[in-house]
UniProtKB/Swiss-Prot annotation:
It comes from Rhodopseudomonas palustris (strain TIE-1). This is Ribosomal RNA small subunit methyltransferase A. SUPFAM superfamilies: S-adenosyl-L-methionine-dependent methyltransferases. Keywords: Cytoplasm, Methyltransferase, RNA-binding, rRNA processing, S-adenosyl-L-methionine, Transferase. One of its GO terms (molecular function) is RNA binding. One of its GO terms (cellular component) is cytosol. It catalyses: adenosine(1518)/adenosine(1519) in 16S rRNA + 4 S-adenosyl-L-methionine = N(6)-dimethyladenosine(1518)/N(6)-dimethyladenosine(1519) in 16S rRNA + 4 S-adenosyl-L-homocysteine + 4 H(+). Belongs to the class I-like SAM-binding methyltransferase superfamily. rRNA adenine N(6)-methyltransferase family. RsmA subfamily.
Length: 287
C-alpha cells in the first residue's frame, strides 16, 4: 500500500483544517484523485525530478506528484490554513516535500534548486495565473530554471495561450508564450470536479521552453504585440503608429503587408517587427 493510500480523504482534510475555499485567494480545490494523478502524469516521468507547485491548498495534486515519484516537491502556499494539511503529507514522504509559506508572485525558487532544472506543475489560483505565467515566460537567462510547465487555467485563458495566428483567441499572450515555448492543450476539467465549482471549465496546458527561441528583444516584442492587439481590428499601418517608428518600416522588415491585421501575423512576424523596432531605437540613440 502506498503512502497516499494512508492519507485521509481530501474532504476530511478540508473539514478538519477549516479549509473552505476563499474567493479572495482564487481558490477552487480539485478533489478527484484520478484527475490529480492525470495532471501529474502529464508532466512525464518524475523520478529524480524536482517539482515546483503553486497553491497546493489541501494537497490533492501534491499527493499525486509525490506518489508518481517526484524526487522532491517545493510547494508554495499563501494560505496559512493549508500548512497543517501539507505538513501531514510531508510526514508521509520524509525529506521530499518542502513547504514554503508565502506569495508565489514574490517568491523565487531558484536558490532551492541546487542547480537542477525543475518542472512547474500547478492548479494555479485563477486570480494570479496569467501574471505568474508571464513572469515565467520572461525569465532570464534563457533557457530558464524550469524544463516544463503543466498548468491549469480557466479554459478561455488556456485557449489564449495555445492559439495560433488566425485563431479567434490569438493575441499578446499567445505571441509571448509560443515565441518562448512549445504549447499544447491537454484536456479539460469540468467545474463539478472542484470545490466550490467554478463557473467555467478549466483546461490543462503543457509548455516546454524552446532551447533556442528566435533571437528577439523581449521588451520590443511585448510592445509591438501590445500595440498591434490593442487595436486588433485596425490594419498594422494604423495600430503600430504609437510605437514612434514608421509602421511601414516595421512591416517591411517582416515581409508583411501593412494592410494586414494583428491576428493574421504569425509569431515569427512579430519577432521580425520587434527586432526592427529595437534596432531603429538603438540607431536613433547613437545618433
Amino acid at each position: 500500500m502506498s503512502a497516499i493510500d494512508d492519507l485521509p480523504p481530501l474532504r476530511e482534510v478540508i473539514r478538519r483544517h477549516d479549509l473552505a475555499a476563499r474567493k479572495s485567494l482564487g481558490q477552487n480545490f480539485l478533489l478527484d484523485l484520478n484527475l490529480t494523478a492525470r495532471i501529474a502524469r502529464a508532466a512525464g516521468p518524475l523520478e529524480g525530478v524536482t517539482v515546483v507547485e503553486i497553491g497546493p491548498g489541501p494537497g490533492g495534486l501534491t499527493r499525486a506528484l509525490l506518489a508518481t515519484g517526484a524526487k522532491r516537491v517545493i510547494a508554495i502556499e499563501r494560505d496559512e490554513r493549508a500548512l497543517g494539511a501539507l505538513e501531514e503529507i510531508a510526514a508521509h514522504y520524509p525529506g521530499r516535500l518542502d513547504i514554503i509559506s508565502g506569495d508565489a508572485m514574490e517568491f523565487d525558487p531558484r536558490p532551492l534548486l541546487n542547480g537542477d532544472r525543475a518542472r512547474i506543475v500547478a492548479n494555479l489560483p485563477y486570480n494570479i495565473a496569467t501574471p505568474l505565467l508571464i513572469g515565467w515566460l520572461c525569465a532570464e537567462p534563457w533557457p530558464p530554471w524550469y524544463e516544463m510547465m503543466v498548468l491549469m487555467f480557466q479554459r478561455e485563458v488556456a485557449q489564449r495561450i495555445v492559439a495560433h495566428h488566425d485563431d479567434d483567441a490569438y493575441g499578446r499572450l499567445a505571441v509571448l508564450a509560443n515565441w518562448r515555448a512549445e504549447t499544447q492543450m491537454l484536456f479539460d476539467i469540468s467545474p463539478s470536479a472542484f470545490v466550490p465549482p467554478p463557473k467555467v471549465t478549466s483546461s490543462v496546458v503543457r509548455l516546454v521552453p524552446r532551447a533556442q527561441p528566435e533571437p528577439c528583444d523581449r521588451a520590443a516584442l511585448e510592445q509591438v504585440a501590445a500595440a498591434a492587439f490593442g487595436q486588433r481590428r485596425k490594419m498594422l499601418r494604423q495600430s503600430l503608429k504609437s510605437l514612434g517608428v514608421d509602421p511601414a518600416q516595421l512591416t517591411a522588415a517582416a515581409g508583411i503587408d501593412p494592410a494586414r491585421r494583428a491576428e493574421t501575423v504569425p509569431v515569427s512576424g512579430f519577432v521580425a517587427m520587434a527586432n526592427e523596432l529595437a534596432n531603429s531605437r538603438a540607431i536613433r540613440t547613437q545618433a
